[in-house]
Amino acid sequence: IDTIADTSSAEAMGVIAALKKSDQTYAHCIDVAAIFQVVYKKIYGGNRDHNVFKDEKQMILASFLHDVGKAKLPSSILDCTEKFENDSREKLLIRKHPLYGAEMLSKMGMPGFMVNMAKYHHVKLDTSMYSSYPEDARYESASKETRLIAIIDIYQALVGRRSYKKSWAPPAAMRYIEQLAGIEYDFEISEYFQHMMGHFPKGSLVELSDGSQAFAISVPKTDLERPQVIIVRNAKGQYLENHTFLDLAVEKDLSISKGLDHYDIFGEASLEFFMNLQVS
């Protein structure tokens, strides 16, 4: 991100440095940008009539800076370990971050689509909802890029680690977004996101119908409920040294019964465990 911003402007470097004052916020922006880059390129990347970004670097920078307005908020708010009440002073300040971000990017001379992503990524289809802000914003003002990053923003907010809440398992977050498609989020773009990520995104820990536990390692092209998986714990509850590969699209006698929180099972070693799977 620093390298990309350095080729853009000194102002971009400055706001990124400001975001780094909160590890939680900075990590959120990094994760959102990483997901946005993959999903947007799959949907629009090959069509120059629909892809507004001049190159991949601009795409990453724009998606990273969607929350740039939080750079104006004090660390005591960004890293607070408690959830704020809706009528609290802190919550009112948080709700201003899209306007702060739009103003900052406009002053920096950033393209209009980047300003749009910062300003409207919290606007819902039903603007009467408390979770929709800025209050006077209309959903029609949100670009397709903004509508996509709104979905990715809430997905990462749910699955990411937060000091004031327990993170959601990725499958639960995907179900949440699916239920709100056409209510809070753009239905068509939500559908694209579902098909790109799958009901069980890569790396999701799941329990199979026989009681074994496995990591999802693919997004199926047809039945989103039946990804390829690698079993890490058998039906007897024993951890395996050599892990079994299964394609649930082929193994019809098995299915996924539920998603699991990998932090509950593996703690901070979850990613390392997943990256070092040994398939027999």
What are these model-derived regions, one by one?
Residues 1-42, 54, 222, 231-237, ...:
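Non-catalytic interface/linker regions that flank or bridge core catalytic/transmembrane domains
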Residues 159-173:
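Active-site-proximal, acidic helix/loop segment immediately C-terminal to a metal-coordinating Asp/Glu
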Residues 206, 227-232:
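SH3/SH3-like beta-barrel fold
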Residues 59-63, 105-146, 165, 177-224:
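Histidine/acidic-rich helix-loop-helix segments that form or flank divalent-metal centers
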Residues 1-95, 105-109:
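Acidic/His-rich, divalent-metal-binding segments that scaffold phosphate/diphosphate chemistry
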